[in-house]
Amino acid sequence: MGPAIASQNKIIELVLAGANGFRLNMSHGSHEVHLENIKIIRGAEKKLGIFLPIVADLQGPKIRVADLKDQVIDLKTGEQFAIADRQKVKKAGMKIPNNFIPVEYPEIASDVKKGDILLFDDGLMKVTVTSVKAPFVNVMVMNGGILKSRKGINLPNVKVSQPSMSEKDKKDVKFAVEQGVDYVALSFVRKPEDVLHIKKHIAKLGGKQWVIAKIEKPEAVSNIEDIVKVSDVIMVARGDLGVEIPAAEVPTVQKNIITVCNRYAKPVITATQMLESMINNPRPTRAEASDVANAVLDGTDVVMLSAETSVGTYPLETVSYMRTICSEAESHCKQDDMRIRRSTMGLPRKEHNTDLIATAAATIAENPDIAGISTLSLSGETALLISNRRPNTPIIAMTEFAEIARRTGLFWGVTGVLIDKAGGTDFTVEHMKQFLKKEQFFKTGESVVITIGRPLVARSRTNMLTIEQIP
C-alpha cells in the first residue's frame, strides 16, 4: 500500500487485475494513515464480495543513519569518519568530531570490530572499520557517495545485539492486532527464537495473526530449516538479503529457501525488485519477467510488489503483467512433476490424517473428470496442505470465519469463502454442493472432491473425503 493506490477504486482495479492481498509497510506512515488504508481495503473487499489478507510488515531492528536535519554527508573515498550514537557520545561527555556520521544504534561500538564492513543506502556506499574506541567506531570510506538522513545501514556477517522487536515494533504489533490485520511480518529474523518471541507477544495481546518470517540476514539463511519449522509463512526479502550476502548468491539462496518451505508445507513469498523498472516504465524488462517466472517455477506461493505499486506510475499495469507472467509460467510447469518432487522431499507427516487426506484429494483431482476440490476448514490447515500438493484444479476453502477466509489468500490456488454453519455430515456436504453451484464455482453435473472433519460437533480434524456431483 502507498499513495499511488490509496483509494477504494484503485484497490478494486488491482484486485480485478490479479492482486490477492495487500501489505502495510510499518516503516513508513503513521497509524492514522495505515488505519485509513485498512478501511479502504476492507471497503473494497466488501464491494467485491471477496476476502483480502492484509500484512503488517514491521520495521524490525533496522539500523539507520540518524536525522541529519536537511543536511547530507559527502563520503569521499579514502577519507576517515567517526560513527557513533549521539546519545552515547553525550553520556560519555565527549565532543562530536568533524567527520562524524550519527547513527541510531547505541550498541555499534560493542558489536563491530576492526576489519568489519558497513554498508550504507542498500550497499551504495561502503566503509571499513579501522579501529573501535567506544563510543566511536572509526572507519575509512571504500566506496563514496552522498549520504542522506535516515538511510539504512547493513553490517554483513556481524551479529548485532539488538532485540528482534524494537519498541516501535511492539506498538505496531498492538495496532495490527487491534485492527484485525491477518499477518504480521517480522523483519531481520536471525533465529527461530525471534519468531517464537513475537508469536508469544501476539498471543498475549489476544491476537491470532500468523507470523511471516522475513529472511534477509546471513544468520537466518544458516538457520533456515529451524526458522521454517516455527514460522507460519516465510518471505524471501531480497532487498536487504542482497546487501548482506553477495548478489550472485541470492538466486541459489532463494531456491533453497523455497525448497525448504515446500518440504514443510509453509507458504513462501518471493519479494523485492520483481518488476522494479515498472516504477517508471509501463512494461517490465525481459530479465524481470524471467525473475518472476523462475520464482514461480521454483515453487513460490506468492510474489510480492513493493514500490512498483505503492509509489509507482503504473501500478495497474504492473499487477496485470505480474499475473500474466505467473499464469504463463504455470502453464508450462509440470504440476505432476512438482507434486512428485514435493512428496519425495521428506515432508514431515502430521500426527493426524489431514496430511493423507490432502495428498489423496490432490491425487484424485489429477483425473480429468474432477473439476475442483472443496474443503470445509476451521483453521485453513487442510486447504494449505492441499495447496502444497499443487493440484491442477481450483481449491475452494469454506469456513465459518472471515479471518480464516482471509488467511487463505496467501495460499497458492486457494479461494477462501464464508459459509453458514451447517448440521450433520450429510447435510453439510449437500450444503457445500449447493453453495458451490450458487456461487458459480462449478456447474451442474461436474464432479468435485469434498473434504471435511467428522463428527462436526467435535470440530474434528479433516478425516473424510468424498467425490460428489454438483446438483
Predicted segments with their positions:
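Non-catalytic helical/linker scaffolds that mediate oligomerization, partner binding
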Residues: 1-471
